Regions:
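C-terminal segment of classical bacterial N-terminal signal peptides
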Residues: 15-24
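Bacterial N-terminal signal peptides that target proteins for export
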Residues: 1-11
């Protein structure tokens, strides 16, 4: 056998470089823990994250509990993700306080956390990629007020009172109505856990209790679809304003059952989350908030290219 020391050295160096590259690829693992999977919204966020993973050459996983009521399950998922010692992680909190002990653990282990969609009550996240939910819900209030003639009774069917999105959308809507429309009375705020069946039942009970109700705001995809179904089942004429999109909501707007809705930019949220996580692993400075934008859409602009770009089925 002819031994070539130079060749052996080259092979050795190549193998070492290969190992380093493999280790680096393994290090660049970024898990995203979302609030759920039951809404098409989260599938759209995932598609943005997957695209960013391709563009930035990192490995991304995307998971969430079956429903947005499963706070404990989400915490378990977060714990498992941190245990894998990822390069960074993305987190959309169901309960903005419940996750704090684990987020402190991530911080102690120098794992950058990027909050997305729903922030947490802490300065641990290096940034939050999200819609300005208070401003978006305030716009929803303006639209609903105009549609009912700026007077009468309205209600809110919210998805929860524990997440940042749930609180901000509720408060943004309620505060705007109270400050700008003195002749409009918010008769009740009810919670349907973002589940369309629960939100349907909540809506029906509201309609029974308030026969003069003129409008309802549903704060996310499941809530809004539940409101539409409840109003349809009760055969009532009520102005409905929703949030997010999805086929059922879009169909309701086209048919006139729903007046319009606020859409976020879910693909953009997913993309910017992974992009920010990659930058955080490199020590790059990030803004505290990455505002991913929102739009009002109704029958008049649902087919506008600017709007169709941020809608999903």
């Amino acid at each position: 056998v002819i031994r070539n020391p130079l060749l052996n050295a080259i092979v050795g160096v190549t193998f070492a470089v290969g190992l380093t590259a493999a280790a680096h690829a393994q290090e660049a693992y970024i898990p995203l823990i979302s609030k759920g999977f039951q809404h098409q919204f989260w599938q759209a966020v995932k598609s943005g994250a997957v695209q960013a993973a391709k563009d930035y050459h990192v490995k991304v996983t995307f998971e969430g509990p079956e429903t947005e009521a499963m706070i404990d399950k989400q915490i378990d998922m977060l714990s498992a993700a941190i245990a894998k010692k990822p390069a960074a992680l993305g987190f959309a909190a169901l309960d903005s306080k419940a996750a704090l002990p684990l987020l402190k653990k991530a911080q102690a282990e120098k794992i950058p956390v990027v909050a997305f969609d729903s922030g947490v009550d802490s300065d641990i996240p290096v940034t939050t990629a999200a819609t300005n939910n208070k401003a978006a819900a305030s716009l929803a209030a303006d639209k609903l007020a105009e549609l009912i003639g700026k007077e009468g009774e309205v209600a809110v069917v919210a998805h929860d009172q524990t997440s940042r999105t749930g609180v901000d959308r509720r408060d943004g809507f309620v505060e705007r109505m109270k400050s700008a429309y003195p002749k409009i009375r918010i008769v009740t705020v009810q919670y349907g856990e973002g589940d369309q069946l629960k939100s349907t039942e909540v809506t029906k009970s509201i309609l029974q209790a308030y026969p003069k109700l003129k409008g309802i705001f549903g704060t996310n995809e499941g809530s809004a679809i539940g409101v539409v179904n409840g109003v349809r089942e009760m055969k009532r004429k009520v102005v409905i304003v929703g949030y997010d999109s999805g086929k059922q909501q879009k169909d309701a707007i086209r048919s006139g059952l729903m007046a319009g809705a606020i859409t976020q930019n879910p693909v953009g949220i997913g993309y910017r989350t992974v992009e920010a996580a990659v930058k955080a692993t490199k020590g790059e400075k990030l803004p505290k908030i990455i505002d991913t934008g929102f739009y009002w859409y109704d029958k008049t602009n649902i087919d506008d290219p600017k709007i169709t770009a941020v809608l999903y089925d």
